[in-house]
Amino acid sequence: MSFLPWSYSGLSQFQTCPLQFYEIRVRKSVPFVETDAVKYGKALHSAAEFYIKSNMPLPAEFAFIQPYLDRLLNLGGKRYTELKMAMAIRDREFQVCDYWDKGAWHRGIADLIITDTDRERAFLVDFKSGKSAAYADTTQLALLAALIFLHFPKVKTVKSMLLFVKAGQIVKAEYDFDSRFKVFAHLNQDLKRLKAAFDSGTFNASPNNFCKKFCAVHTCVHNGEYSE
């Protein structure tokens, strides 16, 4: 089985349950159904994107995020919204490639990047619509920072944040050029497991607290709505 490019969300799903990852992202046997929370998050991201990119007025329900966006707009530099980035491994080195390149190894989409090449830095912002930052994971920021260093070779420092707009909380992380790919060493064991699963074509179920009520893979015996 050919290895497919992975993303932060895809690897997170594989870490939770390889079978769920396979059925949803590889076999695609489960139709994607947007929950109300997902719909809200997508609408919020879209509103923020067009406010930043085109100065389009925010819908009334998202007016509360304007102070955050205005502060970001005051930062000097070139802005990129919903920027798709990817990398490939060629000659044992990480290299830039097109997002849809068949040889892509890792993909990521950044909500907002502001580059200030004169100061060799970039600002990275990922908007979150959750109610709390209590379980925030900065791995996503580290992965996006690695992509930024490849796609913007003049950047030597990435200052990033998870911006929880509803909770009014910010989780910050800073990355430097010399340790730009450290995140892949941190994820090495999970990435080896992912490759082994593709090589063998075996994606085993991993029973967890989400199986009974929240998993969409109803053909799994651990699902609360299991059906053959």
Where are these regions (language model features)?
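RecB-family 4Fe-4S metal-dependent nuclease core
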Residues: 1-228
